[in-house]
Amino acid sequence: MAVKIKRDDQVIVITGKDKGKTGTIKTVLSNGKIIIEGVNTVKKHQKPNPQADVAGGIIEQSAPMQISNVAILNSATGKADRVGFRLEDGKKVRFFKSNNELVK
């Protein structure tokens, strides 16, 4: 099955503690999870490492979340939408199912 959500897509969280938040996908992991900028943030306790010039402390970073918990955001309507595939000029392209516009 083809991947309907890719890197740099605008998505909206549809379930969980961050429901309703939007962001851009930074990474798509192979185990069915994604990392979204500014969503699902966790606090990590970082040990100082003088050899790598890394200061210690508590840092916030985005944690992976299930790809099924997000939907792609349609920029024309501002709402969550479903994605389909079709052939145009011999290339497989993604489109929004609500208004048949291509995903940019």
Curated annotation (Swiss-Prot):
The family classification in the record reads: Belongs to the universal ribosomal protein uL24 family.
Q: Its function? A: One of two assembly initiator proteins, it binds directly to the 5'-end of the 23S rRNA, where it nucleates assembly of the 50S subunit.
This chain belongs to the protein called: Large ribosomal subunit protein uL24
Keywords in alphabetical order = Ribonucleoprotein, Ribosomal protein, RNA-binding, rRNA-binding
Q: Give the matching InterPro entries.
A: KOW (IPR005824), Rib_uL2_dom2 (IPR014722), Ribosomal_uL24 (IPR003256), Ribosomal_uL24_CS (IPR005825), Ribosomal_uL24_KOW (IPR041988), Translation_prot_SH3-like_sf (IPR008991)
The subunit structure is:
Part of the 50S ribosomal subunit.
Q: Name one Pfam family in it.
A: ribosomal_L24
Output the Gene Ontology cellular-component terms.
ribonucleoprotein complex; ribosome
Highest taxon above the source species: Bacteria
One biological process term in Gene Ontology: translation
**HAMAP family per the UniProt record, alphabetical:** Ribosomal_uL24_B
